[in-house]
Regions:
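Conserved catalytic SET/PR domain of SAM-dependent protein methyltransferases, capturing the structural core
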Residues: 1-124
Length: 124
């Protein structure tokens, strides 16, 4: 099965001081470069809460008021994860609904983070 999401070849997943695994720059990334594109299935809030979150956990990003993009099986889960941890001072932003871009120049070895309040409907 092909990955549902795409991460830049300038990135790698490794252990994070923030939480579990994280996404890191393995080469310098220029401001506005595309770092990742989230993929998956589009589902409504009810389907997400009833069928997906209980078994897969929080794996979605919100793309509209009542629409989310998410994996729907355990096999797809790993293939859709971006591993971008949360930060209130992130170095990634979102262009459109699913494209993650560098908000500033990022040096090799920096952890790549985004503000999770921008991708889900939880209260932070």
């Amino acid at each position: 099965m092909l990955p549902l999401s795409s991460r830049s070849p300038k990135t790698e997943v490794r252990e994070s001081k923030i939480h579990g695994r994280g996404l890191f720059a393995k080469a310098d990334i220029a401001k506005d470069d595309v770092v990742a594109v989230k993929g998956g299935h589009i589902v409504d809030r009810e389907t997400l809460r009833r069928e997906i979150t209980p078994t897969l956990g929080p794996v979605e990003i919100q793309i509209d008021y009542d629409l989310f993009i998410t994996p729907v099986t355990d096999e797809e889960r790993e293939l859709s994860m971006l591993y971008s941890n949360h930060s209130c001072d992130p170095n990634l932003g979102i262009r459109g609904e699913i494209t993650f871009v560098a908000m500033r120049d990022i040096r090799a070895s920096e952890e790549l983070t985004h503000d999770w309040a921008m991708t889900d409907d939880d209260d932070y």
